[in-house]
Amino acid sequence: MEERAAVEYWGDYKVIAELGHGLWSRDVLAEHRFIKKRYILKILPSELSSSENFMRVFQEVIVQLAAIRHASLVAIENVSREGDRYFVVTEENGGTISLAQYLSGRKLSEEEVVHLIQQLCDALELVHSIGLAHGQIHLHSVHVSFFNGIANIYLPEVGFASLLRERMFSTIMQSGSARESITRIRDLLMFEAPEEQEVFGREADVYSVGVLAYYLLVGSFPWGSFPKPSLCMPDSWYDWDGFILSCLQQQREVRPKCLREALRRKTSGEQLQVTLDSCREPLREMEIEDTPTELGPPSALIREGERLCEVKEEQHAFVLVEAKSIDEVMVTTVDSEEELESSEGYANPLQSLLAREPVVSRYVEVEREEIKPQPLLTEMIFIEGGEFSRGSGDGQRDELPVHNITLPGFFLDIHPVTNEQFVRFLECVGSEQDEHYNELIRLKDSRIQRRSGRLIIEPGYAKHPVVGVTWYGASSYACWIGKRLPSEAEWEVAASGGKLGLRYPTGEEIDKSKANFFSSDTTPVMSYPSSILGLYDMAGNVYEWCQDWYSYDFYESSALEPDAPLGPPQGVYRVLRGGCWKSLKDDLRCAHRHRNNPGAINSTYGFRCAKDVK
């Protein structure tokens, strides 16, 4: 953390205001020095930053959370480090308060409870789908944000609360009086599932949701022999009894697998079914006078049925008719051969009618070949392999040490992927998410729009590089056309002119006549002169995703293992190269390294593809 003229900085972010302290972070409102956009920084305390056990789990959780987006979850942009302290950069929100603060002196209507619980269930289902759990759901870990005066669920501690259970209790004991601390800890323990001290998972979250729903409806905790919600809210239209009691099951295996499906509204049809079920048993015990005790042949049944239908209007009786299949009727026994013969005139034609199979023409679907959108391919340049130098002695610390590497030959697209190319990929896959629910692109941050189900490119932007695309989208597109993303080493070698080792892709100097930077928007690809190797837009226009995970000190490892280095085996964020239309001149250097998490979306992020030599 730097101090400049009494202004607090964390990396490229200037602190504007303090927002408070959460369970695992100090939260501040900050502004990026260059792009002038506001973010919320969640700064880890030094004791957590120095804990290897916490940081190992922290890294895994951050990587998973960064890949998903939901209005009720923290939107992670990237993770950075300043000295020995880590901080998480998240999107700015309108401010939140804890659910306990929101409920102070307030009684929620059933509609408000339904709105909040449905949002909580939706967010947790998404978290559970990626293998995470919230843990420690209670009135202080669940927050609410406000939009147009409506309270909405917000979960700032998802994935971390269960890791810091002891820290939370210790903080409570150190603040307030002993009586207040004990009362608050007691209330927190009310939300814990029976197994939660040993196991933190989806089932524990489900139990806590049941406790929270009961508290919001009734105003007390479901402790001991508690009254069902239906007794406290007899006019409710929701099956709160079924939902809450299923969540509060002692055996975690029998709790609901899907919270959204468990919470359902009682329809009139369901209420009618409940009424019928309650009436069925008494009706079966009722006897109708003058009912024959002996079952006659089918013909007699018909005549008896006709007689019973001729009931006078003043006679009223409840009759319960128990349905039987026609097979059961047809095998009804008779007492004599004479009665059997008399029924043949009815039975045989009926059996013949039932045995007759209807003649239905077989439907044969006409096979039509589905026409898939075909890719628009980009011309590629062959980059000859060999030994090259990478890194810089006058750049950032992550560009050191300068060292030699060896690479085999490879092909590289002459320009970044354009909107007209990427839109064909979206039409082919039919979604803006991949099979793992990772966003490929966020249309509102791009120049592609969906209107009436069709994808439309904004006028004049067909030849512009696609933006708003994630690393997942870039990688999926490359796979779709039979290519891949370039490695960080390949990208730098191609940008620096191979063995020439240029400072900028355009040479030793660069100006605004040679590249699109420090401007207001993207430009069509190939609008500026090509590099010495015939590549366009290697400097400016859009940052380009690379295949590698980013590591601050990877060049030290690369210097020891120089043969076709491909980044660390895992990490928090992926590499971006080349600078963009917003960048300053220094960001356009061939050796400059940028990074962000693979799910990050930005109007300055694009990509180009590479291919191996076969």
Swiss-Prot record:
<dbReference type="InterPro" id="IPR011009">
    <property type="entry name" value="Kinase-like_dom_sf"/>
</dbReference>
<dbReference type="GO" id="GO:0005524">
    <property type="term" value="F:ATP binding"/>
</dbReference>
<comment type="subunit">
    <text>Interacts with PknD, interacts with and phosphorylates IncG.</text>
</comment>
<dbReference type="InterPro" id="IPR042095">
    <property type="entry name" value="SUMF_sf"/>
</dbReference>
<keyword id="KW-0808">Transferase</keyword>
<feature type="domain" description="Protein kinase">
    <location>
        <begin position="13"/>
        <end position="276"/>
    </location>
</feature>
<dbReference type="GO" id="GO:0004674">
    <property type="term" value="F:protein serine/threonine kinase activity"/>
</dbReference>
<dbReference type="Pfam" id="PF03781">
    <property type="entry name" value="FGE-sulfatase"/>
</dbReference>
<comment type="similarity">
    <text>Belongs to the protein kinase superfamily. Ser/Thr protein kinase family.</text>
</comment>
<protein>
    <recommendedName>
        <fullName>Serine/threonine-protein kinase Pkn1</fullName>
        <ecNumber>2.7.11.1</ecNumber>
    </recommendedName>
</protein>
<dbReference type="Pfam" id="PF00069">
    <property type="entry name" value="Pkinase"/>
</dbReference>
<comment type="function">
    <text>Together with the serine/threonine kinase PknD, may play a role in the specific interactions with host proteins during intracellular growth. Phosphorylates IncG, an inclusion-membrane protein required for the modification of the nascent chlamydial inclusion.</text>
</comment>
<keyword id="KW-0597">Phosphoprotein</keyword>
<keyword id="KW-0067">ATP-binding</keyword>
<dbReference type="GO" id="GO:0106310">
    <property type="term" value="F:protein serine kinase activity"/>
</dbReference>
<keyword id="KW-0418">Kinase</keyword>
<dbReference type="InterPro" id="IPR000719">
    <property type="entry name" value="Prot_kinase_dom"/>
</dbReference>
<feature type="binding site">
    <location>
        <begin position="19"/>
        <end position="27"/>
    </location>
    <ligand>
        <name>ATP</name>
    </ligand>
</feature>
<dbReference type="InterPro" id="IPR005532">
    <property type="entry name" value="SUMF_dom"/>
</dbReference>
<dbReference type="GO" id="GO:0120147">
    <property type="term" value="F:formylglycine-generating oxidase activity"/>
</dbReference>
<feature type="binding site">
    <location>
        <position position="42"/>
    </location>
    <ligand>
        <name>ATP</name>
    </ligand>
</feature>
<dbReference type="InterPro" id="IPR016187">
    <property type="entry name" value="CTDL_fold"/>
</dbReference>
<keyword id="KW-0547">Nucleotide-binding</keyword>
<keyword id="KW-0723">Serine/threonine-protein kinase</keyword>
<dbReference type="InterPro" id="IPR051043">
    <property type="entry name" value="Sulfatase_Mod_Factor_Kinase"/>
</dbReference>
